[in-house]
Amino acid sequence: LLGTAAATVLLLAASSAARADDAAKVLKSMTDYLGSQKTLSASFDSDIEIITPELQKIQFASSGQMKLSRPDKLRVRRTGGYADVELVYDGKTISIYGNNAKSYVQADAPGTVDQMIDAVQAKVGVGMPGTDLLLSNAYDELTAYAIDGRHIGQGVIDGVECEHLAFRTSDTDWQIWIETGAKPVPRKYVITSKTLAGAPQYTLRIKDWKTDAFADADTFVFKPPAGATKADLDSGAIAEFDELPPGTPSGAAK
């Protein structure tokens, strides 16, 4: 009996290790595939949760589109109840336009999309959840602080069969659903903050993936709409570009 129990424990341990290795392998196939594409475009729906001081959970929803041309061009449009924002990067200048505010900010940012994303999040303070999936070193970034990874099984997102992976870090849990087959693109991405009361989540659903070249030469050219005003990057106007409404409690969001 003891021998059987020991064998069972060893089998479970081996199975757990195999599942962890499998999770890393599936994730790597996704990041390698995305990273190898010269151009990418997709549509997305996102939900971000906040926890109020009264411990009520509120969710804000938005939708958008993304177009990427490696290594140095990106265009993202996101529309929600409190923000209608467009980010355009041409390899030299980053432009962020807020349609509700009818104003835009610009900054010199020569380099790659990877460098631009780092600069925006670090210097401007505009959150860009999900952009880590687009980085050229996405696998390293996603797994940098992971303490556990598991291949949970299969799932279906928007009618598409996916592999379901779950990873943990010290302060967040995150899950990703990756399409099976020859094009392993991410279909759903969920980040759960464990250090905040109520464990708020950020959820991203991605669809309409395309890898076609963009025929329009103006895709990554920012043209301020008539009547738009230019705001200073360091001014309070940048708050107009947030995904959350004014007055959201500090620290309440994921």
Mark where each language-model region is.
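Edge strands and adjacent loops of beta-rich recognition modules
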Residues: S136-L142
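Gram-negative outer-membrane assembly/targeting C-terminal domains
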Residues: A226-K254
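Short, surface-exposed linear segments at secondary-structure transitions and domain or protein termini
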Residues: R70-P71, V113-A122, V185-R187, K210-A217
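Gly/Pro-enriched, hydrophobic low-complexity segments
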Residues: D21-V26, A42-D47, S95-I96, V105, ...
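Sec/Tat signal peptide C-region and signal peptidase I cleavage site
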Residues: S15-A20
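N-terminal mature ectodomain segment of secretory-pathway/periplasmic proteins
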Residues: D22-S103
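Acidic/charged, solvent-exposed loop-and-adjacent secondary-structure segments enriched in E/D, K/R, S/T
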Residues: I96-D132
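Bacterial N-terminal signal peptides
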Residues: G3-A13
